[in-house]
Swiss-Prot record:
It comes from Streptococcus pyogenes serotype M3 (strain SSI-1). GO terms for biological process: 6-sulfoquinovose(1-) catabolic process; D-tagatose 6-phosphate catabolic process; lactose catabolic process via tagatose-6-phosphate. The gene is lacD1. Its EC number is 4.1.2.40. GO terms for molecular function: 6-deoxy-6-sulfofructose-1-phosphate aldolase activity; tagatose-6-phosphate kinase activity; tagatose-bisphosphate aldolase activity. It comes from the Bacteria. It catalyses: D-tagatofuranose 1,6-bisphosphate = D-glyceraldehyde 3-phosphate + dihydroxyacetone phosphate. Signal peptide: none annotated. NCBIfam families: lacD, PRK04161.1, PRK12399.1, PRK12858.1. Keywords: Lactose metabolism, Lyase. Belongs to the aldolase LacD family. This is Tagatose 1,6-diphosphate aldolase 1. Pathway: Carbohydrate metabolism; D-tagatose 6-phosphate degradation; D-glyceraldehyde 3-phosphate and glycerone phosphate from D-tagatose 6-phosphate: step 2/2.
């Protein structure tokens, strides 16, 4: 794979020696739910913006880049560490739960040109995709991603595509039924969107198994032997020639770190992570119940510990994207 000099320059800005140790805080709907669990009533715009600022101030000195949204995160972009790169999200949050299609939608007041002008070093777009889903729906999704890829090509800025797999017939992605399908769903979507017509530079993906069902990682029911889980990671590596990074999917910091060791040992040559809740989730109840100062203390201690430990794991497990580009 070859990229332009400008795209390479931007990728260097969001990584450190070819490893992307990025902090994800573009959550909107999920963050509102987390906040609402600790107070009466919905989270306010000020609450959301302020927590994003706190996280950006305290944790970006230890991240190669931060992913924020332009809806609530623009103030946070102003206080990030100077050496830390910036990814901006282009999609609307959530999806229509009354249908199985989960069609994508851009933020209507934004374009790649505008996100770049707001300081983005890369553009991130999230797509829900069922590789076995309705053919017409998938054609619409593919056309949508082609348009975003073309925008990023025109602006000469890297395109990070986040793929979240699902099955149109299974509502619970954490179920045993979905766990059996997950390797095929995750790796199949990666293969589809690695085609050059989509203009994707980096894939942000799930690990291809639910680690809660992997032999040796659970005390409950097992749905993958160690050998089956290893093969799922090997198949993932074979599914794409593009650099790819892992999302944390809301699991604990400890499980995410253990997963990265397992992935690397299996032969997955991932180039880093975009890690969100595994790093900062514990700050939410502290912020809501005890205020800004206590949240800042949490970020400086436990938040720092989470990101520092993750960086150490990445040093041992991740492969530079420069090996693929």
């Amino acid at each position: 794979m070859t990229i332009t000099a400008n795209k390479r320059h931007y990728l260097e800005k969001v990584s450190h020696q070819g490893i992307i140790s990025a902090l994800a805080f573009d959550q909107r709907g999920a963050l509102k739910q987390m906040m609402a669990a600790h107070q009466e009533g919905e989270a306010t715009v000020t609450q959301i913006e302020t927590l994003k600022v706190l996280v950006s101030e305290e944790l970006t000195p230890y991240a190669s880049s931060i992913l924020l949204d332009p809806e609530y995160g623009l103030l946070a972009t102003k206080v990030k560490a100077n050496q830390t790169g910036l990814l901006l999200a282009y999609e609307k949050t959530g999806y229509d739960a009354t249908t199985t299609s989960r069609l994508p939608d851009c933020l209507v007041e934004w374009s790649v040109k505008r996100l770049k002008a707001a300081g983005a070093d890369a553009i991130k777009f999230l797509l829900y995709y069922d590789v076995d889903g309705d053919e017409q729906i998938n054609l619409q999704k593919q056309a949508y991603i082609e348009r975003i890829g073309s925008e990023c090509t025109a602006e000469d800025i890297p395109f990070f595509l986040e793929l979240l797999s699902y099955d149109e017939r299974i509502s619970d992605n954490n179920s045993a039924a979905y766990a059996k399908l997950k390797p095929h769903k995750v790796n199949g979507a990666m293969s589809v969107f690695s085609d050059k017509r989509f203009g994707v530079d980096v894939l942000k993906v799930e690990v291809p198994v639910n680690m809660a069902y992997v032999e040796g990682f659970t005390e409950g029911e097992v749905h993958y032997s160690q050998a089956e889980a290893i093969k799922a990671f090997q198949d993932q590596e074979a599914a794409s020639h593009l650099p790819y990074i892992y999302l944390s999917a809301g699991v604990s910091a400890k499980l995410f770190q253990e997963t990265l060791y397992f992935a690397a040992a299996a032969g997955a040559q991932f180039s880093g992570v975009l890690c969100g809740r595994a790093t900062w989730a514990g700050s939410v109840p502290v912020y809501i119940t005890k205020g800004e100062d206590e949240a800042r203390k949490w970020l400086c201690t436990e938040g720092f510990q989470n990101i520092d430990e993750l960086n150490r794991v990445l040093e041992e497990t991740a492969s530079p994207w420069t090996e693929k580009i």
